[in-house]
């Protein structure tokens, strides 16, 4: 589904040639903590695809994260960005550690990576496993990935009137970025309409308070929809204030189909939505840009379990499939999704976060056996 979306977007034309490629160069960026344990899972799955799908992969080990910062002075080395830009069609990014106290010179490498690579959209499917008890959940959260408060323009100063510290942060919403993210969200909704017979786009904002910034986001999303009624007219268009969105998301998640949100709200909503389908350890995402797709599991570096061999690899394996889908290899992606769903639905081989006792590698082996 997602590959056909990407090829229709002018911003993603550079991805179009990858559908014909049988040999792909994939960057592997484990990062910190359990990232070092789950990224090898994605690599093993890709290596397994050659016999059936005729795909071959060249893997390049790359570095980013807090440990890299401690060793080199840079959380995102120039060489990592250079290799991704010049050699890779896709990449897998694990997780990064966030220090509990301020560390001079350190900032999140994934935020910088999204900016450097032009990864304007974070696409996160949130779906319950078929056959589970309860009403099925099946939504896609599309998050603008390059601006909002995450542009990291901040300052701290002393208020002259009180003599106390004040911190300010700039929130940026641009017409260009909003138009781009609204288009990809509507195109995803359009594909779901074609495969399901109905689709709804929900635009999330806080324009009742932030009338200029969120007001612009709301305005441009509506404009993209209204000015392309010949294309999107059968998609139902809704808006939801972000605080009531949180309430409805957890009370009635089945009401949502495709959600589009500015960076901060999308970050919060998509992590929260993972609780609806079991764990952050099972939810994938893809960072999509003009020339490259980077799969990224939704969980963090989990220092409490790092090194124990019990991290859940499912989110990374699904992110690997999502990356392939955007790169035009839908059949291979679907095989991975089916193998993962079979593991979750039928198997007892699950990591502790899902109530099991299996190791990371045991789960990987079970998924591979189902491929």
Swiss-Prot record:
Activity regulation, per record: Inhibited by the reaction product NADH. Inhibited by oxalate; this is a non-competitive inhibitor.
Biological pathway: Amino-acid biosynthesis; L-lysine biosynthesis via AAA pathway; L-alpha-aminoadipate from 2-oxoglutarate: step 4/5
Molecular function per GO: homoisocitrate dehydrogenase activity; magnesium ion binding; NAD binding
Presequence range in chain numbering: 1-22
Subcellular location: Mitochondrion
EC number annotated for this UniProt entry: 1.1.1.87
UniProt-annotated site: Critical for catalysis, residues: 150, 206
Cofactor: Mg(2+)
Span of the signal peptide: none
Keywords tagged on the record: Amino-acid biosynthesis, Lysine biosynthesis, Magnesium, Metal-binding, Mitochondrion, NAD, Oxidoreductase, Phosphoprotein, Transit peptide
Cofactor binding description: Binds 1 Mg(2+) ion per subunit.
Binding site for Mg(2+): 243, 267, 271
Note: Present with 19079 molecules/cell in log phase SD medium.
Protein name: Homoisocitrate dehydrogenase, mitochondrial
Species for this entry: Saccharomyces cerevisiae (strain ATCC 204508 / S288c)
């Amino acid at each position: 589904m997602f590959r056909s979306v990407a090829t229709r977007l002018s911003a993603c034309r550079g991805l179009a040639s990858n559908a014909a490629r049988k040999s792909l160069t994939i960057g592997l960026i484990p990062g910190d903590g359990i990232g070092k344990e789950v990224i090898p899972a994605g690599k093993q799955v890709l290596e397994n695809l050659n016999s059936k799908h005729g795909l071959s992969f060249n893997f390049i080990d790359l570095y980013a994260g807090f440990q890299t910062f401690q060793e080199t002075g840079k959380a995102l080395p120039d060489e990592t960005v250079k290799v991704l830009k010049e050699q890779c069609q896709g990449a897998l990014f694990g997780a990064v550690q966030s220090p509990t106290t301020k560390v001079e010179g350190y900032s999140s490498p994934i935020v910088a990576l999204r900016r450097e690579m032009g990864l304007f959209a974070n696409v996160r499917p949130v779906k319950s496993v078929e056959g589970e008890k309860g009403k099925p959940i099946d939504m896609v959260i599309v998050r603008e990935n390059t601006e909002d408060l995450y542009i990291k323009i901040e300052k701290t100063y002393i208020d002259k009137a009180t003599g106390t510290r004040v911190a300010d942060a700039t929130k940026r919403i641009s017409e260009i970025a909003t138009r781009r993210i609204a288009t990809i969200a509507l195109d995803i909704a359009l594909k779901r309409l074609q495969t399901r017979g109905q689709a709804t786009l929900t635009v999330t904002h806080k324009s009742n308070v932030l009338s200029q910034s969120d007001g612009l986001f709301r305005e441009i999303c509506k404009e993209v929809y209204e000015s392309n009624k010949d294309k999107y007219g059968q998609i139902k268009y809704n808006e939801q204030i972000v605080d009531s969105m949180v309430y409805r998301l957890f009370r009635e998640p089945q009401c949502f189909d495709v959600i589009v949100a500015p960076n901060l709200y999308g970050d919060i909503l998509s992590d929260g939505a993972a609780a609806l389908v079991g764990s952050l350890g099972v939810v994938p995402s893809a960072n999509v840009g003009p020339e490259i797709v980077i799969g990224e599991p939704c969980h963090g570096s989990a220092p409490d379990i790092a090194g124990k061999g019990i991290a859940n690899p499912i989110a990374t394996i699904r992110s690997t499939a999502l990356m392939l889908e955007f790169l035009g290899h839908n059949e291979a992606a679907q095989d991975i999704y089916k193998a993962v769903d079979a593991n979750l639905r039928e198997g007892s081989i699950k990591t502790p976060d899902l109530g099991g006792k299996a190791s990371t590698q045991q789960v990987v082996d079970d998924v591979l056996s189902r491929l």
